[in-house]
Amino acid sequence: MSEFPLPNVSTDLSGQVAFVTGTTSGLGKRFAKVLAACGAKVVATGRRVDRLEALAEEIRADGGICEPIVIDMTSRDSIRAALVEAESRLGTVQILINNAGIPDAERAIKMSDELTDAVFDTNLIGPWVLSCEVARRLIEQKMPGRIVNIASVAAFNISGAIATTLYSTTKSAVVRMTESHAVEWARNHINVNCIAPGAFSSEMMDGMLSRVGDISQGFPRRRICDPAQMDSTLLFLVSPASECVTGTVIKIDDGQGPR
């Protein structure tokens, strides 16, 4: 899928443990590979065991360190258990990438309680719980850390033509969560920032395109972005270069949306 080298922009993350959610496809898979290529010890998490193991094997074949751990982002017990398992295998998590998310793909008045709960739990409650668990450990050990939340440009703009009402709502909340956690944990040297992607190639995007058709021709550059084009921003936010950057939201959308 990618025409870009791995990683697109490099930095040294040797010795740091990076916990990435939603790594079985799309952006999360790319994030895990990029962080490992830069020396981080990666905890790759998700629901699909076969894909997690395949990703870990791929990273190890390239000389990286990766431990696959199954996680259910709708279950607080699963989240906490996965973090404990990650610590037992690799040590304290210093980098957290809250990437896991699901779409609603349904009009608000037609959404079932089950879908509503799943979207809220996966997109907001799960990242909240995981962020707090990681931060608590870092604070107890007086260690600095980096948390990067993945929101969406849907947090800022929504089209009535596409059923994304609840998805947009949860991603808006992720933006505010980023800002709030950044303020609360600044004194502890835990930087919390957010990336708000536009249309990038992923399973979620493929699903949307199958429902609404090709949207790229309405974009100024008439393209869907490649996950590799997010490398430099991700690495900036987890590296010493962003030491003074916290509570910031960076839109990466190729000029696709309004301002």
What do the PLM-derived regions correspond to, one by one?
Residues 2-14, 235, 246-259:
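Short C-terminal tail/terminal secondary-structure segment
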Residues 24-25:
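Conserved glycine-rich cofactor-binding loop
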Residues 107-108, 112-120, 215:
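Substrate-binding pocket helix/loop in short-chain dehydrogenase/reductase
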Residues 131, 170, 178:
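Active-site helix of classical SDR
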Residues 136, 183-184, 243:
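Alpha-helical segment proximal to the catalytic Tyr-Lys
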Residues 152:
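Residue(s) in the substrate-gating loop at a strand-loop-helix junction
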Residues 186-191, 245-247:
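Short, small/polar-rich loop/turn modules that mediate ligand/substrate recognition or access, typified
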